[in-house]
Amino acid sequence: MKGVENTLSQSESVNRGYNGWMGMESETSARATHSSEQMISLEEYVREMLPMHLQKLLMERIIEAEQTGAAHTSVFAAPTGVAAQYPAMGPPMLPGQTFSSRSFAEGLVVGQLSVIVVLIFFIKFFIFSDGPAKTGGGGGSSAESRSSGFTGSPLTSTTSRLLSTLIKRGGKEGTEFAEDSENERTRQINAILEKTYYDVETHSPESLDWFNVLIAQTIQKFREEALQKDNIVHSLNDFISRKSSQLPNYLDAVKITELDIGDDFPIFSNCRIKYSPPLNKKRLEAKIDIDLSDRLTLGIETRLLMNYPKYLTASLPVKLTVSMLRFQACLTVSLTTAEEFVPTMAATTDTDAGDSEGHYLVFSFSPDYRMEFDIKSLIGARSKLENIPKISSLVEYQIKKWFMDRCVEPRFQFVKLPSMWPRSKNTREEKSDMQEEDPSRAPE
């Protein structure tokens, strides 16, 4: 009730002020009709009379508020009258009204931070996570890999499943091909032969003339570099110096006296694709006939040291020249992975274990190969013994034994294939005519 009375008193005071102003205005207009000298302009009224009326109205408002004791209630009451016309003169904003905007800003910041943390966690542990530990040759390392598999395998398997769903082959999901792992390799071989229109049983052998041209160009480049920079001579001398500690004590230092790298090229022919017999049609291999008729010569000299009855009692000079004249064989080439073959050495180094990943080009020669030599020997200083048959047969046997232990079936050599994905560091550009004339000029 007090609030209503205060509101009524406010409206009455405003009305009184308005009536007083209207009365003064009518009185002023009356005076203006009687005498133009006593006329008060609007500017003078706003400057002199209006402040007095407003001050009087304000004093009455303060006195009434003190009398009723409801000054606090009247200030925060609902806006009516003048307060309704001027909202800026209403009650001040309470601290509780700013709480909603502040809490919204804090919630927005916390939400953004939580999303960033989740993204960082996902990228670190699902995208850039390390693979499972490599399994060593011993039983202890395999046990460790099995024990560590409980922590690493779920994460890597989840990542692999996530990425495998993105890869498709021929419009089909990649997981469809990985489910049947037993027949997967056979299915791939059959698909390759079918889509390339190649029948292993009836397809005629190929001549490989284009391949002979490429191989001839490569060998020619090697020969030019060997003649210009003596790379082969330096390599052989370095090899002999490294192996000098393994020579028996009755041999002196070995020196190279002659080197002939030939001028002919190997001829590859009669290429045919066959199934690899040990794997039951799970791998393809290419069989190529190779024929080389050239003269590749290496001449060395050394001394036989006579250390009995005293050290360096006498020495016997020895000169040996070995020339390969003919080589014929059937070359077998295939692609494989490291899991499909067993190393011949029992112990492997860390670098060999790191190279066991990826794909390899495997090649070997058939046991019925043909290798012809021309071996010349000269022993002695004054009374010389020349071309002893026993020495020739011994040298030829050692060369063939070295070759069979490394390149003849069932032994083979493998070469790791590089990554075939295009990379910026492997990108080159052909030189223009201006750059060939001036090699120092770089392209703009």
Swiss-Prot record:
<comment type="subunit">
    <text>Homodimer. Component of the ER-mitochondria encounter structure (ERMES) or MDM complex, composed of MMM1, MDM10, MDM12 and MDM34. A MMM1 homodimer associates with one molecule of MDM12 on each side in a pairwise head-to-tail manner, and the SMP-LTD domains of MMM1 and MDM12 generate a continuous hydrophobic tunnel for phospholipid trafficking.</text>
</comment>
<feature type="region of interest" description="Disordered">
    <location>
        <begin position="136"/>
        <end position="157"/>
    </location>
</feature>
<dbReference type="GO" id="GO:1990456">
    <property type="term" value="P:mitochondrion-endoplasmic reticulum membrane tethering"/>
</dbReference>
<feature type="transmembrane region" description="Helical">
    <location>
        <begin position="108"/>
        <end position="128"/>
    </location>
</feature>
<keyword id="KW-0256">Endoplasmic reticulum</keyword>
<feature type="region of interest" description="Disordered">
    <location>
        <begin position="425"/>
        <end position="444"/>
    </location>
</feature>
<dbReference type="InterPro" id="IPR027537">
    <property type="entry name" value="Mmm1"/>
</dbReference>
<feature type="compositionally biased region" description="Low complexity">
    <location>
        <begin position="142"/>
        <end position="157"/>
    </location>
</feature>
<comment type="function">
    <text>Component of the ERMES/MDM complex, which serves as a molecular tether to connect the endoplasmic reticulum (ER) and mitochondria. Components of this complex are involved in the control of mitochondrial shape and protein biogenesis, and function in nonvesicular lipid trafficking between the ER and mitochondria. The MDM12-MMM1 subcomplex functions in the major beta-barrel assembly pathway that is responsible for biogenesis of all outer membrane beta-barrel proteins, and acts in a late step after the SAM complex.</text>
</comment>
<dbReference type="GO" id="GO:0000002">
    <property type="term" value="P:mitochondrial genome maintenance"/>
</dbReference>
<keyword id="KW-0472">Membrane</keyword>
<dbReference type="GO" id="GO:0032865">
    <property type="term" value="C:ERMES complex"/>
</dbReference>
<feature type="region of interest" description="Disordered">
    <location>
        <begin position="1"/>
        <end position="20"/>
    </location>
</feature>
<protein>
    <recommendedName>
        <fullName>Maintenance of mitochondrial morphology protein 1</fullName>
    </recommendedName>
</protein>
<keyword id="KW-1133">Transmembrane helix</keyword>
<feature type="compositionally biased region" description="Basic and acidic residues">
    <location>
        <begin position="426"/>
        <end position="444"/>
    </location>
</feature>
<keyword id="KW-0445">Lipid transport</keyword>
<feature type="domain" description="SMP-LTD">
    <location>
        <begin position="204"/>
        <end position="418"/>
    </location>
</feature>
<dbReference type="InterPro" id="IPR031468">
    <property type="entry name" value="SMP_LBD"/>
</dbReference>
<keyword id="KW-0812">Transmembrane</keyword>
<dbReference type="GO" id="GO:0070096">
    <property type="term" value="P:mitochondrial outer membrane translocase complex assembly"/>
</dbReference>
<dbReference type="GO" id="GO:0005783">
    <property type="term" value="C:endoplasmic reticulum"/>
</dbReference>
<keyword id="KW-0446">Lipid-binding</keyword>
<dbReference type="GO" id="GO:0120013">
    <property type="term" value="F:lipid transfer activity"/>
</dbReference>
<feature type="topological domain" description="Lumenal">
    <location>
        <begin position="1"/>
        <end position="107"/>
    </location>
</feature>
<keyword id="KW-0813">Transport</keyword>
<dbReference type="InterPro" id="IPR019411">
    <property type="entry name" value="MMM1_dom"/>
</dbReference>
<dbReference type="GO" id="GO:0008289">
    <property type="term" value="F:lipid binding"/>
</dbReference>
<comment type="similarity">
    <text>Belongs to the MMM1 family.</text>
</comment>
<feature type="compositionally biased region" description="Polar residues">
    <location>
        <begin position="1"/>
        <end position="16"/>
    </location>
</feature>
<dbReference type="GO" id="GO:0015917">
    <property type="term" value="P:aminophospholipid transport"/>
</dbReference>
<feature type="topological domain" description="Cytoplasmic">
    <location>
        <begin position="129"/>
        <end position="444"/>
    </location>
</feature>
<dbReference type="GO" id="GO:0045040">
    <property type="term" value="P:protein insertion into mitochondrial outer membrane"/>
</dbReference>
<dbReference type="GO" id="GO:0005789">
    <property type="term" value="C:endoplasmic reticulum membrane"/>
</dbReference>
<dbReference type="Pfam" id="PF10296">
    <property type="entry name" value="MMM1"/>
</dbReference>
